[in-house]
Every structure is written in C-alpha cells, then in structure tokens.
C-alpha cells in the first residue's frame, strides 16, 4: 500500500469496510477510558482515528503523539457508534480503526493553538507556516487558486494569450515610488521592479498579439493599508481593436464568470455605469459602496449668502463645498454618538461636524434641535429641509470646507453610519454584492506644490475624442477614456483606452510639462513604437488579492496571501528586509550613508 491512499477529509461512507492509508497532522489527541482518539488533519479536513489498546505497539505510539505531530496511519473505515456522529464534518459519520501508526516527524509544542481565533497578527505572521495550517487560511488560498484558474479559463476562451513581461525594467513615473534594483554590471545604474506591465502590454499590442494577459506580481513602494501590499498580484489584460464599451462588457462578463464558478454568486446581469462627477457629488468617493443607502445633498449654492460664515465661506471659495448627509431615524442617536462621529471626521481633516435633528418638521425652526439653527435664516432652514427630504425623526449632518475635505469626511461618515449596528438595524445598508463602473475620470489633476498638471491615472490613458483640443489649451477640462470597476466600495479593477498615436502621446507629455528630451529619454521606446502603425487598444488590471479578500470575507489582503508583508513592509517570518554584507554592497558600487544624528 502506498504511503497515502486517501485525503483525511474525503474519507466518507463510500469507503466503509475498506483499509485506507492516511497522512496528516494531529489536530487533537484524546484519551477516553483506555481508547485513544486522534483527530487527523490534512488539507481536505479532519477524520477521527480510533486507537484500540488491543494493538499494543500501535497503542504505545499513539500514547506518545502530540498536537502537530506528522503521522501516517493505516486502518479500517467503519461507521461511528450511534450518538457519536459529527454532522459538522464531511467525514463525521465514519471513523478509522487504526491498525498501524507511524510518526513521520515529531513537533515541538506549537506557540499557539490552531483553533485560537484571538491571535495577534504579529504572532500569526511570525509563525506563518503554522498559521497557514489553519482551516481558514487553507480555504482562502485554495479560493485564490480557483479564482486564478477561472480567470485563465475565461481569458483563454476569449482568445487571450498569456505572455510574461520583464521583472527587471526601467524606472518610469507611474505615481508611487519604484523599488530599485542596482546593476552590478552597469555601475551607478538601476533597474526598477514593475509597478505594472503597462508599457510592455501596450508594446505587445503594437507587436500584433491582439489579446494579452498574465497573472503577475507588481511592486509599489508606498504607505500600506489594509488593502495594500508592497508586492501584489494583478490579472493584467490588454486587447486591440475594441472600444471602451466593448472592453467593459468583456471584463464585466469575466468577473461575473469568476463569481459564479468560485462562490456561486450571480452578479447583476448588467453593471450600472456612473460618471466620476456623479459619484463624487452623491457619495464623495470614486469607489462608492452602493450597499449603503445614504447620499449627499448639495448645498453649496444655497449657502453662498447666509450669515453663518462656517457655511458661506467655503460655499464662496473656488474649491469649497457644502454638503449634507440625511440619516433616516438618526434622531435616535445620542449626543455621545454625535460627539464620536465629530471626532471621527476630524481624522479626514474636518474641523467639526454640524448637525440638525428634525423632531417636528411642521413646526419649522421650533421643531428642530441643533447648535447651528440660531445662525440660519428661516429661508435657509427651509431650503435644507426641502433639499434633503428630511422627515420627523431624522438627523442631518453637514460638512463645509474644501471639496476634498468634505468628500473625504462626509464620505467616511456615510460608510461608518451605514455599516454601524444602528445602520443595520434601520435598513441603511443592504446585503449582497453591488458592482458598478465609474467612468469619465478627469485626465489630469493640478499639483499646487509643483504648479503643474499630473496624470490622474497614468500618462498613457487616452482623452475622450471630444476633449483632444483641450490638451494644449485647457488640460484641466480633459476627461479620460478611463474606467474603474467598483464592488462594495472597493476598486477591484481599473483600466482605460490607451493613446495609440505618437502625436497625441507627445501632447499629453507636454501637458504634463515633460519636455521632448525628457520624454525621449524616459519613453522613447514607446514613442518610437507608436509610429509603426500602433492599433487602437485598451485594457484593464484586476487586483487578485482584493477580489479574493472580498470573496473570503477577510479583514485584510494579508489573509489571502501566503507570505505577506506587514504595514511596515516587513516579512516577520524571514525578517526581511535585512542588512547585507559590505562585500555585496561593494560589488554593487553602493556606499550606505549613515542617517544624520539629531542635534543635542
């Protein structure tokens, strides 16, 4: 008999009466009145093994095994006795009567119990190998595998070709910092790890591969959050001779296919499409969570002439905004709740949080409870109540500041209230999956510090045809042929139609204050390629880590990556990054500069 004939979790009634050979780890060992029970675990699940003292040698071995010992057992599959069936296990109706037990490798005492759900992330990442044995991590990584498989299946069927692009490439500005790799052979010069395969996949379209994809690592040296890692995985795609709508349809179908085949979820037959300007106006975010049934009310124009400077000053500012968020039944919120929300919005730059409770709308001013009502005229109060559609028992929150502060703070408050216990109890958040496309993004953003425009996405995105004329006259008016797929408040994919004509690409570089010499130095290979009959093309990249995180219901993408980094970009398992030998630095022509010591 081979070392293993079955997986533990797959031993069921179909093997009754058969002798099996199993390998795995001891999840738990229990001694019940002279009979030893072992819960044996492998990647497919658990099976109960019964060790009877009638087999003395085997029983002696069983007495010595402990949790996480790696063992092999051979035994007979039989029904569990009446009253001992475990309906929570796939193998819960049977057990294996052990005939032979071999310890393949002993284990020291683990630093934690694998069924402990209250471990710190530091402990889990330091002992990641043990953490990966936990059923939830096994599930997450197998789900990740299935998502990748289904993405490949779909793309293969649609005629896409899997092509690898370089990992050692040229440093080009794409927003975040590059991870640099010094060249030993070319002293003083550096490769960069790719932030994306963006330029190479465009070159593949010029090279007539028509449809490309790869599931690939990308690298960005940026501050980390729950949904960010210094190295992450993209489902990266590019296609020729399709327009923006056709590209969206193609990849919308892919996401529907992946969700249906991996977690049996039917996403909407057609994803809604929302312009960027509408998303910001209604939700203060370009990745709105449509499950939350709360929206902004625009008040900027109505507050321009009020005496209340907190509202009128930003209402009259060039980049100011005044907006309201009506919360149905929010009158139930206590002053402590409101104070907590006030402190919360300060995180996003808000100076405070104005509010009005609507107790009896019919009474006008006298039916309202608020510290700001005394500063507003009756006409302004009436306008607020009418626009927000407030009813008795509601509360209205206000934000008045620079538009970015209003959007960030009120947008975060919308999500916090919507997903709170209060929000759930009052129907302010829906269950399920709410996908959408956000389109018509600004082509450029203005950087006040550098006094120039920067690319909102990347400088290879095509402007909308009707906005080409603005590239040289008014870049701020340009909208891009860019699109993001958003799901439950997460951007899971983003892409665009690309610039395929050299003269348009050069105009974009000029709008970004990238001169001809600099453009040739950094992007000459692209500009040259575009002159050889480059086809119209576009694409998209999906964050595999994010998609799997959402499907798994995990708190962080670190829970769906085998060996992730911390939020300080450290690997606690291998202790990377780490110092290197002076000899290695000399070979790379690198000398470390000691950090300056603070002055006494």
Swiss-Prot record:
Q: What is annotated about its quaternary structure and interactions?
A: Homodimer.
Q: Which GO terms describe its biological process?
A: aspartyl-tRNA aminoacylation
The species this protein belongs to is Burkholderia cenocepacia (strain HI2424)
Protein name listed in UniProt:
Aspartate--tRNA(Asp/Asn) ligase
User: Lineage, please?
Assistant: Bacteria, Pseudomonadati, Pseudomonadota, Betaproteobacteria, Burkholderiales
Picking any one GO molecular function of the record gives: aspartate-tRNA ligase activity
GO cellular component labels = cytoplasm
Q: Which reaction does it catalyse?
A: tRNA(Asx) + L-aspartate + ATP = L-aspartyl-tRNA(Asx) + AMP + diphosphate
Which residues are listed under the site Important for tRNA non-discrimination? 32, 83
């Amino acid at each position: 008999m081979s070392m293993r004939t079955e997986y533990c979790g797959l031993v069921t009634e179909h093997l009754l009466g058969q002798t099996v050979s199993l390998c795995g780890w001891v999840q738990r060992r229990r001694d019940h009145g002279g009979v030893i029970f072992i819960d044996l675990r492998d990647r497919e699940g658990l099976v109960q093994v019964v060790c009877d003292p009638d087999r003395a040698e085997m029983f002696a071995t069983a007495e010595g095994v402990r949790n996480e010992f790696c063992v092999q057992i051979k035994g007979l599959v039989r029904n569990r006795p009446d009253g001992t069936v475990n309906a929570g296990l796939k193998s819960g109706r049977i057990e294996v009567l052990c005939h032979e037990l071999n310890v393949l490798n002993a284990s020291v005492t683990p630093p934690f119990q694998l069924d402990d759900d209250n471990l710190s992330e530091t402990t889990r990442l330091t002992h990641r190998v043990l953490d990966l044995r936990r059923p939830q991590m096994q599930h997450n990584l197998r789900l990740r595998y299935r998502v990748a498989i289904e993405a490949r299946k779909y793309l293969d069927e649609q005629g896409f070709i899997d092509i690898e692009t370089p990992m050692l490439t040229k440093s080009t500005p794409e927003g975040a910092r590059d991870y640099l790799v010094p060249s030993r052979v070319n002293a003083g010069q550096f490769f960069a790890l790719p932030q994306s395969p963006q330029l190479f996949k465009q070159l593949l379209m010029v090279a007539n591969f028509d449809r490309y994809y790869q599931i690939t690592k990308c690298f960005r040296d940026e501050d980390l959050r729950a949904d960010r890692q210094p190295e992450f995985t993209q489902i990266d795609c590019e296609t020729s001779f399709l327009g923006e709508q056709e590209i969206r349809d193609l990849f919308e179908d892919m996401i529907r296919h992946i969700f249906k085949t991996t977690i049996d979820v039917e996403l909407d037959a057609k994803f809604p499409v929302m312009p960027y300007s509408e998303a910001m106006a209604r939700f203060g975010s370009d990745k709105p969570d449509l499950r939350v049934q709360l929206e902004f009310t625009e008040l900027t124009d109505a507050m321009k002439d009020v005496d209340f400077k907190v509202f009128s000053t930003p209402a009259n500012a060039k980049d100011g905004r005044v907006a309201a968020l009506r919360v149905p039944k929010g009158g139930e919120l206590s002053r402590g709740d409101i104070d907590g929300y006030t402190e919360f919005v300060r995180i996003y730059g808000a100076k405070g949080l104005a509010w009005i409770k609507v107790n009896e709308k019919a009474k006008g001013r006298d039916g309202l409870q608020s510290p700001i009502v005394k500063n507003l005229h009756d006409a302004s109060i009436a306008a607020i109540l009418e626009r927000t559609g407030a009813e008795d028992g509601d509360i209205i929150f206000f934000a008045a500041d620079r538009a970015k502060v209003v959007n960030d703070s009120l947008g975060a408050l919308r999500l916090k209230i919507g997903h709170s216990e209060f929000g759930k109890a009052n129907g302010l958040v829906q269950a399920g999956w709410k996908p959408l496309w956000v389109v018509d993004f600004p082509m450029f953003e203005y950087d006040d510090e550098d006094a120039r425009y920067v690319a909102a996405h990347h400088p290879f995105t095509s402007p909308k045809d009707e906005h080409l004329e603005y590239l040289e006259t008014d870049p701020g008016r340009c909208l891009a042929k860019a699109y993001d797929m958003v799901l439950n408040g997460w951007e899971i994919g983003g892409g665009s139609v690309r610039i395929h004509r050299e003269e348009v690409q050069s105009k974009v570089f000029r709008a970004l204050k990238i001169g001809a010499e600099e453009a040739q130095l950094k992007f000459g290979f692209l500009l040259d390629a575009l002159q050889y009959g480059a086809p119209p093309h576009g694409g998209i990249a999906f964050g595999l880590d994010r998609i799997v995180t959402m499907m798994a219901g995990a708190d962080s993408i670190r829970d769906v990556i085998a060996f992730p980094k911390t939020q300080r970009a450290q690997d606690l398992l291998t202790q990377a990054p780490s110092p290197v030998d002076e000899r290695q630095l000399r070979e790379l022509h690198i000398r470390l500069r000691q950090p300056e010591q603070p002055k006494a």
